[in-house]
Amino acid sequence: MPEKKGSSSEKVLYCSFCGKSQHEVKKLIAGPSVFICDECIELCNDIIRDEVPAESGDAKAAKSDLPVPGEIKASLDQYVIGQEPAKRTLAVAVYNHYKRLKHVQGVGKKEDVELAKSNILLIGPTGSGKTLLAQTLARLLNVPFVIADATTLTEAGYVGEDVENIIQKLLQNCNYEVERAQRGIVYIDEIDKISRKADNPSITRDVSGEGVQQALLKLVEGTMASVPPQGGRKHPNQDFLQIDTTNILFICGGAFDGLEKVIQNRSEKSGIGFGASVQSKTERKVSEVFREVEPEDLIKFGLIPELVGRLPVVATLGELTEDAMVQILTEPKNALVKQYQKLFAMDGVELEIRPSALTAIAQKALARKTGARGLRSIMEHSLMDTMFDLPTMDGVQKVVLDEHTIEEHTKPLLVYREQKASA
């Protein structure tokens, strides 16, 4: 019994586990008709720590949550073909960013060294994989992710989206969990389209260009953004949610068409004289020129100096080659060929795409100058009629796509079960 009578008429309480009285222990905690002392609680904690060491250690959890740069790049390799320098730069930048978050959260006292945030700027032609890189990173790290189009943003008070709408979309993606949203990734696409229209400031308002850049400044650097709750502005009496953007990683991407001319003009001015290396403009690829980009080039292009300073990590992506296009069609986890083979398999039909057809698709996509985005439209156009007729056709076992289908727009070869059996 946990209760016994003492010499005086008062009740003395005893631990139900070790039998010690309330006078022999520091604390006795009551439960439903039972008591437990502080010594027994400490003993229970020791047993749990010994038997479940993995769950009690924060180090392992931190390690599993935070892949190292090599693992990040290996995951990117599964989805993104080529662009090795950009993948390495991104892997290191993202690793350092989330290491910084662990440093901020794990340290209770004020540290001497304060780690600053390094946002990322991706420069590369259309269809080179900028958005895919950001999407793959967010999927790997299991953090909220949102893509914002810079061309739809305007200054506050004008028709269009405010920059705070980006944070609201991020909140929506994580079901309005503020803590998760504050560790998310924001990808701002077409950042080059909000460049200043001219080098010298204009007297007229540039509400979708420099004005948006000014509005993005504090958001990218870190500020308390006021976001309406789930009900939006329909309930004006509700308090706005306060989101700290200090720990949100911002990745900005753009094609920066014309930036290569700015870089070349700068390099040509610096390369004057007998010792200067003479090289024709046509000899160098745009991707090679982009690798030499300096902050002053981005400012000359039309980004304001303050925004350039807040995007310290610059990764450049190159134009895709024919071989890279063929690899994109077949190698990634969600490769286009695998997707169409899965669609045809749902109808019980095998899809075979010959190597000559893959080369023809890659060449056609390169001619369109839309990067990897052009691959799907070419595949869709080549297989459209077959996908329309196939569900109502009997006996088809295989569809074969060759270079003639791509180049001459002929119908793919159909192999029937009877023909295959007789062969």
From Swiss-Prot:
The keyword ATP-binding applies. ATP binds at residues 125-132. Residues 3-56 form the ClpX-type ZB domain. SUPFAM superfamilies: Glucocorticoid receptor-like (DNA-binding domain) (SSF57716), P-loop containing nucleoside triphosphate hydrolases (SSF52540). Zn(2+) binds at residues 15, 18, 37, 40. Keywords: ATP-binding, Chaperone, Metal-binding, Nucleotide-binding, Zinc. One of its GO terms (biological process) is cell division. One of its GO terms (molecular function) is ATP binding. One of its GO terms (cellular component) is HslUV protease complex. It comes from the Bacteria. Belongs to the ClpX chaperone family. Component of the ClpX-ClpP complex. Forms a hexameric ring that, in the presence of ATP, binds to fourteen ClpP subunits assembled into a disk-like structure with a central cavity, resembling the structure of eukaryotic proteasomes. ATP-dependent specificity component of the Clp protease. It directs the protease to specific substrates. Can perform chaperone functions in the absence of ClpP. NCBIfam families: clpX (TIGR00382), PRK05342.1 (NF003745). This is ATP-dependent Clp protease ATP-binding subunit ClpX. It comes from Methylibium petroleiphilum (strain ATCC BAA-1232 / LMG 22953 / PM1). The gene is clpX.
